[in-house]
Amino acid sequence: MAQQLSLFGSPEPEETPVTPAPAAAPAQPEPAPEPAAAYASVILDIPTRALSEPFAYGIPEPLANEAQIGSTVLVHFGNRAAAGYIVDIAPELSDLQGNDALDPARIKPVEAILSKPLFTAEAARIAHWMSREYVATLSECLRLFLPPGGSPRVVKGDGGVWTVERPAVKPIQNHWVMLTPEGFDYTPPKTAVRQRQLIEVLQCGPVTTRDLNLLYNSMSATIKALEKRGVVIVEERRAWRGCSEQTTLSSASGKAPVALTNGQQQALAQIERARLDAHGDVVLVDGVTGSGKTEVYLSAIERVLAAGRSACVLVPEISLTAQTVGRFRSRFGETVAVFHSRLSAGERLDQWDMVASGAARVVVGARSALFCPLGDLGLIIIDEEHETSYKQGSSPRYHAREVAAEMARRYRCPLVLGSATPSAEALDRCRRGMYNGATWTRVEMPERPGHAVLPTVRIADLRREFAHGSRSMFSKPLMEGLERVVERREKAVLLHNRRGFAPFLMCRECGCVPTCNHCSTALTYHERTHTLQCHTCGSSWRVQPYPAPTSRCPKCGSRYLAKMGLGTQQIEDALHQMLAEDVAIIRMDADSTRGKDAHKKLLEQFDAADCAVLLGTQMIAKGLDFPEVTLVGVVNADFALKLPDFRAGERAYDLLEQVAGRAGRGDRPGEVIIQTYLPEDPVIRAVAEHDRSIFTDYDLDQRRDALYPPFVRLVNILVWSANRDDAQDYIGRIAKLLKRRWHAAAPDFLRAGSAVPQVLGPASCVIERAKDRYRLHLLVKSPVGYHVSDDIDACLKEVGSVRGVSVSVDVDAYDLM
């Protein structure tokens, strides 16, 4: 079997059956195991909480040269075959950590090597740290470091046969034709027209056989003839898909400015000190919108590359990558790789391989780019560090900022966090000065380069608008602002953080609001498709609301099933009716950006327009740099303010301050108009006065009194099941065990001068039912600095698993819904 599977990677069937060797007859003694040349710690690719540590396997002599840390291997575990990943190798079993008491005679052998090394020993150690920190399985943490398309896996097929499944994504090789030194002097016969054509083309540089065949139908025979004569050579080179992410955005230039501002110089100097100290320290670049944080990043990376090291840059939104990658490639050329989920599987694989091979030394992308195999990592940058998109929504539920800080400590490189609205956690750590052994330093950048100034902010009080008889979605100040933009042929950005046409439908007779059959959420109406859609599970239903003659309430049968509230599609229709036909109205939300490169195409369309309005959800609020934008309007600032979440105010402030920063980034002054029914709210006042402390002082007082982060660590334990009683019983047992554990340890906490962890709940989630599963959760508030994850992991192992019941642990939770 080992011999057969060692051929993995050669062109053979996609699945290879794995048949365990037949057991020996009971009357015959088992043969002595083949002596192991070495021993390996193997993480099994079996996602279960019970397998929380590596297992020891022997490496037979025939595989000794192939087996390396990072290799995927085939092993047997119990009565099944399994894939695993080697994370350590030692000549003796006793040298493997935690395996010194094992009997070598009982150690099973590695059956086959399924892949070359896919990760480093340091990556394996970081995965182990993540597994402990986020109460996740080792295998799912390690998979983050594997190439896109995955590694070989062992799956159970029909008839109970285990098979090795290969990655479906394969590299592509291009064949390049080029002239030899002698070929430049070669003169083909006059009758050899195609030879002359080929040589003329190749004198400009190498060309792929594919392009030659497209230009001249078929050139294969001509190429072979000239190759035999030594005129040309054909060279096989790896094709790098995903490198063509070019953009026409005018703001994507990476040209260095004439001079840095004082704030930029101070930030760059602090980053350089952290780089030279090599302690893994953190620098928070706290710069107002438009203050030139990206130029600080570019200058810092230049120094890192000059020192022979590499850099990783994270951005929060896919819509930002086109601009960011454009600026970085303009400065650093093709040494920049891009990595995000909108690339195809083949493009992601090639970008990953570019990094692994050293062809790319800078990676720009979403949070997953953090796990690309950069050699000698010298700098990590997280732009817009306050963004919640850096928190992974599925297991392992890591936060990119925390993993990056751990990586910076291990690689002894600086971590740079940039934001105009830093998170409460980042600001708190800078106030403390030290966190987890690293120094946290905040550098302010309070001014914009050149003559640019922060925009003026006007508050449109919708209560007064209503009192004066206005029923429009646009206040008088916002309508006048849009008219001025059109007159001056400028551009505007409108934010409305609700996609669809209307947030919900409601029966005007009985008050019924149609909800999803599978979730406890109201359905959103989409005018273009005449559907009600669930934004939780994706289900949809055809509907004709009032005044359509077929409109019917699902509860009482009334035809007055009316559209309620505003969505981006409805605002788009209103703008088309209000503004001149030559004004481009461009909508950016989750519905309009589903296709490949949709973000980039819409932004390029906005950039190229003479006069335009960019309407969208939160994806347009940060990072976009268009000097022609002189007006930003917020259609309704109140949606995010009163959500049942202690972070609601922080998120609302971040969103409003960030979108306000899109205005006035060029030579022309900017104006921001915020429509609200709550003008006295601290969030609205802070944005209007450009004074963050108005909000943060109020918000921190509220969090301190209620014991919320950053004063504690918050863990959300979520349980879901199709049977509510099963979910209730399971989470109740978890809560009971945790309370008992910490009650018994209370004297130890008090002697150490620490608060005792608290358990709140269990209770039903705000979204009580999703995808036909009932959801309950409990919250744990833990003292900062106490590793609560170990306690939770121990309790979950004690409770064990229950059929039909699922559990997840979200450490440093952001989503409590």
Model-predicted regions and their roles:
Residues 750-754, 758-771, 808-817:
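Short proline/glycine- and acidic-rich turn/helix-capping motifs at secondary-structure junctions
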Residues 728-760:
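Short amphipathic alpha-helix segments
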Residues 45, 200, 704-709, 765-771:
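Short, flexible, solvent-exposed loop/turn segments with mixed acidic/basic and small polar residues
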Residues 1-416, 426, 433-452, 487, ...:
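Accessory, non-ATPase domains that flank or precede helicase/AAA+ motor cores in DNA-metabolism machines
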Residues 332, 579-581, 741-752, 800:
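Short helix-capping segments at alpha-helix termini
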Residues 693-694, 700-701, 738-739, 744, ...:
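Surface-exposed amphipathic alpha-helical segments in non-transmembrane regions
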Residues 251-261, 265, 269, 279-728, ...:
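Inter-lobe coupling/hinge segments of SF2-like helicase ATPases
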